Amino acid sequence: MNLLRLFVGAAVALSVAACSLPGQPKRPVTHFILADAAAPASRAGAAKPATLLLHEMEAAPFQQDTRLIHSRAAGTRAHYQYAAWSEPAPRRLTWLLRQRLQAAGVFAAVAPLGAGVVGDYQLNTRLIDFY
C-alpha cells in the first residue's frame, strides 16, 4: 500500500514538474497581404453616368478568418497554424475589386453598399473557395 502511494505521488510530482519545463520557442505567425499583381487597365471611353454599389463579398464562415486555408485531401480544409492574411480574404478581395472597377472607368462612381450613396446598379459577389 505504501509502495502504491509512493508511486502515485511520484507520478503526480513528475507530471506537475513537466508542465514547468521550458518548451520550444514559439514560432512567429507570418502575415500576408493580398495585393493586386497587375496594374488596373484604364478605359479609354467615357464612363456611364451611373453609380455601382458593391456589396461586401459573401463567404462561408470558415473563410471569414484571417488564417490561411489549405487542403491535404479532396473535400477537406484546414487552417495553417503559422500563416495568416492581414485581414479576412473576402473583405480584402472586395476592396481590390472596388479599386479595379473604379480604375476601369466604366461607372461614374463605385461605392460600397451601405455608404449612404444612391446607386443605379448593385453587384453582389460570393467567394466559393480560396485556398
Please report, for each region that a protein language model flagged, where it lies by residue.
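Short hydrophobic/aromatic-rich motifs at helix boundaries and adjacent loops
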Residues: 6, 65-71, 98-100
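A structural "domain/chain start" motif
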Residues: 20-90
